Amino acid sequence: MKLLVLLVTLLVLSWTSAEDVGDQEILQQHNEDNNHKSELGEAAPQRTDNETSQLGQETPTIRVARAYEFSSKSNLEWVRWNGHIPSNAVKISNTYVGREDYVCRVGCEAGYYTPKKGPSCFYPYGFTEQHSKMFHILVNRDNFEILEWKWKTGGEVPENAVKACRDLYVAKNKYGLGKLHQSHHVFYLPWKGTEYKYNEYYVLNVNMDVVEQKITNVRYNMKGVEVHKDKPETLRSTSVKNYQCREATKQVTLEKSTETSQSWDVSNSITLGVSTEVSAGIPNIADVSVAVSAETSVEISHGTSKTESTSHSLSVSATIPPNSSCSITMEGCTFKANIPFTGRLTRKYSNGKVTSSSVKGIYKKVQVGEIQAVLHRCDKIADAKPC
């Protein structure tokens, strides 16, 4: 009889799954290091009604916390769940439970989605693990951004941390994905119906250490492009006087420098402080039609705009009547055009990694053209000696 009881006991023990063992480890870790009252001195703050109501609303385009606001041009975006995992969805290999978990968000609350648990995003909220079938998944289009997990403690946030919104950030620990609540100074983990908190965690971070960037394969779409031409304006003027009693012919030279500005504004973010090389043909818009030159390389030191100075020189032979003063001007028209284009943006990082992504953008140019000399009517010189 004792032998039979022993065998039954061994069978029961053998039925304990690895995940149950994992639950025990998490509970032990939670009890040792993550008691809400012992670490915070009181229960974790409750959400207000206003905050709770935001769970079902759209939240701002993803931003990266840094000295300046990360623009909506980032390849990172929150994509609404439509029943299928989007291409280039951000995921982790959760070795603790042996599955792939995807970064998701319900309202402002970051959590995880895994196909093994059905079409829901699981997230920590109000001391419990909650889930919703209405959620967004984080996507890194073309895997263009280099994403890294940076270890932090006590609510610390790295410079380029990925925000869910407000002071909530995408984070994880060895057990899985959750959220870093910066004002609470802790990381929250959803686990089997309960919300656990931890002082140590990893925050999802964007590597911004770009050393080179290039725009190549530029193709302009000339369909429907209109060139705007301003009225002629005076660039330079001079006057020529003839005090003689007969006509005089004089050679006049007019010189002036004008600025031509051009930019390739793309749908992706350009890393500031890093020069950009653009390999493309250059549209010439100072005419009725737009002509594109052969491909050349343009080095841009800041952003995607470049301004160049062009010198103009005109020589005019003017016949001046006796005792007269004639005005001669250099005139030109300002041309402006916006031309859609497609291309490819490539980045090189200090660690040697290279990423690239397709881009759409607008080529903008302001150029002065149709420069000519104009001889205006001559006037008699009032104080000239009579002939």
UniProtKB/Swiss-Prot annotation:
Its EC number is 3.4.-.-. Belongs to the natterin family. Contains 4 disulfide bonds. Residues 31-40 have a biased composition (Basic and acidic residues). Keywords: Disulfide bond, Hydrolase, Secreted, Signal, Toxin. Residues 19-46 form a propeptide. The keyword Secreted applies. This is Natterin-4. The lineage of its organism: Eukaryota, Metazoa, Chordata, Craniata, Vertebrata. Pfam families: DM9. Residues 1-18 form the signal peptide. Coiled coil: none annotated. Residues 31-57 are annotated as: Disordered. Expressed by the venom gland. It is found in: Secreted. It is an enzyme of class 3 (hydrolase). Shows nociceptive, edema-inducing and kininogenase activity with release of kallidin from low molecular weight kininogen. The cleavage occurs at Met-Lys bonds. It comes from the Eukaryota. GO terms for cellular component: extracellular region. One of its GO terms (molecular function) is toxin activity. Inhibited by tissue-kallikrein inhibitor TKI and trasylol. Plasma kallikrein inhibitor PKSI527 and classical inhibitors of serine-, metallo-, thiol- or aspartate-peptidases evokes a minor inhibition of the peptide digestion.
